[in-house]
């Protein structure tokens, strides 16, 4: 099954079955959070610059715990690369904030 949401820039971002399998195999704690992952891309608290043109959508899901969704945008399409949970807000704070400016 293919899921899509719009990024803050209005670009459709895909979550494919293959990427979902990767996310849940590497980060089993995210198995029940597919909708949270999509919601984080659509409505992040902030977007950070990643590596090689990746973007990191970040949303706090519990006090001190952030859901980070790594995705790529092309001109009219995009896709989710991976996602993970972190409590390391200081490492996130070191990245360039893309949105909001």
Q: Where are the model-predicted features located?
A:
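Ribonuclease/tRNase effector modules and their secretory precursors
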Residues: 1-101
């Amino acid at each position: 099954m293919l899921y899509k949401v719009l990024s803050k820039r209005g670009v459709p971002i895909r979550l494919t079955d293959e990427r979902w399998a990767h996310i849940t195999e590497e980060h089993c704690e995210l198995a029940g959070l597919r909708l949270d992952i999509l919601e984080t891309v659509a409505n992040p608290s902030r977007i950070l610059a990643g590596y090689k043109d990746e973007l990191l959508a970040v949303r706090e899901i519990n006090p001190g715990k952030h859901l980070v969704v790594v995705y790529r945008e092309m001109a009219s399409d995009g896709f989710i690369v991976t996602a993970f949970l972190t409590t390391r807000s200081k490492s996130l704070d070191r990245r360039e904030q893309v949105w909001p400016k």
